[in-house]
Design a protein with these regions (language model features):
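Membrane-embedded glycan transfer/ligation machinery
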Residues: 107
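Gram-negative bacterial Sec-dependent N-terminal signal peptides
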Residues: 1-22
């Protein structure tokens, strides 16, 4: 590829930079451009019969593949024109014909293959083509810019940073240099500390989860206690990018609730975690280990050590799967006979209908085992559903959550034992959150949430209902 042509190839990048956003932000996954590449994919075509377009003396000529093959100079001009103008549809038609030509510019063909692969979402293939080009022509800034962007898209952060650093040393046009700086800033933000926090004031019914019945035969149960709680949450996490999409993470968080009038129900959990993972444009997988400590009633209650596996993948631009498995061992500092281990497996499927609506369904399995007291052993089978909606131009948004589950215990409960039955619980959880984008303060939008939780059981002591209403405030730094 002649040197003049290598710089001419910057023209489509320069044009796109003029209309680019101020910064290549880390958008919400459901609106991320790289997951929409196949939505406008051209229909299968017979490339030998579809005409190409060549501009000659201000006119656009319609020429079929056979004619182009008989005119190598015209075919080369058509190929070069499609690449320089970043005409994906034109490259898709002309490239197969161009590759049949004996006399061809191998570098131009390789560059066109890279552009087409990237447009079709085959980013790894595009990176391979661009690397081959850079190896042959290290001073091709247009190719290096596309390589850097493809590496960024595929979340190979360390390699992308290296390429953008090299581009910074080039004498690029100001608009492209600005884009390079924005990409470098976005890469730094990917690996920066992320701090998030929130709090809410809750009016809560049945804090102590007392049974629905006050009396059962000769037994009298505790009365239900209502109260106001202050819920809080604060967390921080950092990611360190390694080579080829690998990364390590570390973080910590603390969350809990305080009941000003009922301090014996105060509950707090604090934990730290660290792990390693791999991510590219479609998937994110990793393993993390964690340590958590819980206090209840302002006194130490338990601590847990465990590990968590996760695998998230975009199956299509609109469908995403989220899977995780967690194992942990809990030590109860108040009652050694309550030590246990747990296993949790969760799978979710999310459908993003558009930027304003999404649906989610999930299946959960949770198992808890206590070697010292089999009466605490149970399996829980859960089903989850969520619907998020932004209501047109009104500014109002909502999130509806529904959940149902069954708990199967290994042994009878105290009261179910009188009936000769193992304990069986049925759970129902519902919540509705509402917020309006016009209501915010310093980037924080308050969210009103109403929730209801109900447990039905063949053991009367474990039947209860719980209602909560609260306004929550969340912020990510």
């Amino acid at each position: 590829m002649p040197a003049r042509n290598r710089w001419m190839l910057l023209l489509p990048l320069l044009a796109s930079a003029a209309y680019a956003e101020e910064t290549p932000r880390e958008p919400d996954l459901r609106s991320r451009p790289e997951f929409r590449l196949h939505e406008a994919e051209a229909k299968p075509i017979d490339r030998e019969k579809v005409p190409g377009q060549v501009r000659e003396k201000g006119k656009v000529l319609q020429i079929d593949g056979e004619t182009l093959l008989k005119n190598p100079e015209l075919l080369s001009r058509a190929m070069y024109s499609a690449v320089v103008s970043n005409n994906i549809a034109g490259i898709r038609v002309i490239l197969p014909i161009y590759l049949q030509q004996a006399q061809q510019d191998k570098m131009l063909a390789l560059y066109a293959q890279g552009i087409l692969a990237q447009a079709d979402g085959r980013v790894k293939e595009a990176i391979s083509h661009y690397r081959e080009l850079i190896a042959a022509q290290p001073d091709a800034p247009a190719v290096r810019m596309r390589l850097a962007a493809a590496l960024f898209e595929n979340r190979q952060n360390e390699a992308a940073a290296d390429q953008f650093d090299r581009l910074k040393a080039e004498n690029l046009p100001p608009q492209l240099m600005e884009q390079v700086e924005l990409y470098r800033k976005a890469l730094r933000e990917r690996d920066a500390w992320k701090v998030n926090g929130g709090f809410s004031v809750t009016r809560e019914h049945n804090i102590n989860q007392a049974p629905k019945r006050q009396q059962y035969g000769k037994w009298t149960f505790p009365k239900q206690v209502d109260g106001t709680a202050v819920n809080y949450r604060l967390g921080a996490e950092k990611k360190w990018s390694l080579k080829n999409g690998w990364y390590t993470t570390a973080g910590g968080d603390v969350s809990g609730r305080v009941y000003p009038g009922n301090k014996k129900f105060n509950d707090m959990t604090a934990g730290v975690s660290g792990g390693i993972g791999f991510a590219d444009r479609r998937k994110d997988a990793g393993l993390a280990v964690f340590h958590e400590r819980r206090t209840y009633g302002n006194d130490a209650y338990s601590y847990t050590n465990g590990a968590r596996l996760y695998f998230n993948r975009w199956q299509t631009p609109k469908w995403q799967t989220l899977s995780s498995a967690e194992w942990g061992r809990l030590k109860n500092t108040r009652r050694a006979r309550s030590d246990n281990t747990h296993l949790q497996i969760s799978n979710s499927l999310v459908f993003y209908r558009n930027a304003r609506q999404y649906w989610m369904g999930g299946l959960d399995f949770y198992r808890e085992r206590n070697p010292a007291d089999r009466g605490d052993n149970f399996n829980r089978y859960g089903l989850r559903f969520a619907w998020g909606q932004e209501w047109g131009g009104s500014g109002l948004s909502s999130l509806l959550r529904l959940g149902a589950a069954k708990r199967h215990y290994e042994k009878p409960g105290f009261f179910s034992g009188f009936k000769g039955e193992r304990r069986r619980d049925k759970e129902l959880n519902t919540s509705l959150s509402l917020w309006h984008r016009a209501l915010y303060f310093k980037g924080i939008t308050p969210r009103l949430t109403l929730s209801h939780r109900e447990t039905r059981s063949n053991d009367v002591f474990n039947e209860y209902e719980k209602n909560r209403a609260f306004v929550e405030f969340n912020k990510t730094f």
